[in-house]
Amino acid sequence: MQSKKKWFVVFILLAALAGAAFYFLYFIRTPAYALNEARVALQQHDSAKFTRYVDVPSVMDNAFEDIIKAESKINNDNVFSNPFALGILHMLKPSVVDLMTQEALDKIAAKPDNTPKQPADPVPDAMKRNLERHIPIKNLTVKDLKLSKHEGETATATLVLRDKDLEKDFIAELLMQQNDKGDWQIKKVSNLADFIVQLDAAKRAKQALLNKPVMERLNKALQATSERLTLNKDSNKIGSEEKATLTATIMAKNMSNVAINRMYYDVTVLNDKGEQLYSYPEHYQGSIAPGQAVELTTTKKLNSMLPDDKKLMNLDIAKETVKIQVTYIAFDNGEVISPKNFVE
């Protein structure tokens, strides 16, 4: 009888162990397990384990395209509609993605900044740094990470990031897929372009709030009394390429009690809804006495090969309006009014 009880206990233990083993083998092949392991690898600076659960080259490859999409949206400049620019980007992409991947792995491994590195081609390296400036990693901390969806061969994880400077939370959606070895990997940040645009908008909103008193002083110091736009197309046309000259004539008056000797300003073309169509920076060097009005005439060469220029050239410019936004004023007494630029 005791022998039967003994074997029964052994059977129960074996069944429990088998169940635990089955659950373990199943669990290590789930997105939730991969997420946790990626988090642990990041905390432990284990780049080998991290790359098992995060396909870094794939993430960076997708990030390259998404960052350019975001930059185009932020700057209102659709680079994807320019075949020449697009060709250059695709030519540089492999080198830039390789640099971004290696730098990411070095940071995960916590390699010191003074670690000797292979010399990088200056053009891809400069482009890499330009792309990276849109995502201020040093300002972001992980607030939460959880699996939000699992359907068949794909899964989505939600990463909540806190920007300590903006004091605001942002969400990154991580797309996960199972590889040939059965491990789940993060393959891309699905909403990276929108993430960057939202981050940029939050930076600009904070910048506008902090700079509001300065901008009010700038606008009070110099006021536009009249504006006029003209657009003259060049008669010489080369193939499909057209050129034109945009001229903005603005009468501006010094409303302060000190002479202005230098200023920078943006010339902006607006439609009838007040939406920005085109903008370019200009400057003025010369003395404007208190109460004096001066004519600010600026010209901008346009080329139909550039999408924004072509769009402007096709408009009835007489129906559009122009305004200036002063961004810097230097007075004769040495005083300077200039907003701080928080958007990097």
Regions found by a protein language model. Give the residues of each.
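Low-complexity, intrinsically disordered terminal/linker segments enriched in charged
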Residues: 138-235, 286-297, 336-344
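Short extracytoplasmic
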Residues: 32, 43-70
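Asparagine-centered strand-capping/turn motif at beta-strand->loop junctions
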Residues: 251-257
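Surface-exposed, charged secondary-structure patches
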Residues: 75-166
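N-terminal Sec-pathway targeting helices
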Residues: 1-17
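Transmembrane signal-anchor/signal-peptide helices with a preference for the extracytoplasmic
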Residues: 17-38
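Short beta-strand and strand-turn-strand segments in soluble, beta-rich domains
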Residues: 139, 262, 272-284
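Terminal connector regions
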Residues: 219-223, 278-279, 301-344
